[in-house]
Amino acid sequence: MPLRNVAEYLERSAARVPDKTAFSDAAGAVSYRQMLHDAQALGTVLAGLPGCRNAPVAVMIGRTAASVTAMQGVLQSGCYYVPIDEQMPEARMRSILGQVHARAIVHTAANEPQARALTDCAPLVSLEEASQHTPDEALLRARREEILDIDPVYVLFTSGSTGTPKGIVIPHRAILDFTAWMTEFCGYTEDEVFGNQAPFYFDLSGKDVYQTLSLGASTA
């Protein structure tokens, strides 16, 4: 059956290669099984928030495996994510959050201080705390079934060099089609170990994340 939601990449790979490393960083590695569990636990928490239905959720981003888990957790809830560089000035963070009207801000223990400065913008959700919840798979499935392939996966903001940063919406279909084309054109397989070359708030990172998840490959 053709895919229409990129969240299915992680689910299918976790079912096929559960114990394989999905993403790794200086702090360690996360398997497909663990990433799916933590993403679904986060998705369950987000799905319980008011107005969190096919809505924007900000993710405080570093170049870590946990950041990928957080992004996938947002998708599991049926929402879409807005990457926020943890090192950008607070004024820029507030500008982005104000434009998208984020329903929540997901953060990790590593960037909690930056997130706490934004508590007046949206509720904070800790990835580590959310991962302790039991995933409600039926709820998440129902939420994702509402999503069309023209709905957003994420919104990236431009540098703002010409004024106010502007949001660029990336839909599910764009990622599904591009990932399928890249796999065919380059002959990628699940044996690949990709190198993450771009920060997750930059468009090129989508290739690193979704090529990996779609194949059941690994990224370091």
Regions found by a protein language model. Give the residues of each.
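Conserved AMP-binding/adenylation subdomain of ANL enzymes
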Residues: 166-193, 203-220
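Catalytic "switch" loops of ABC-type ATPases
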Residues: 197
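Carrier-protein-dependent adenylate-forming modules in NRPS/ANL systems
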Residues: 1-174, 186-187
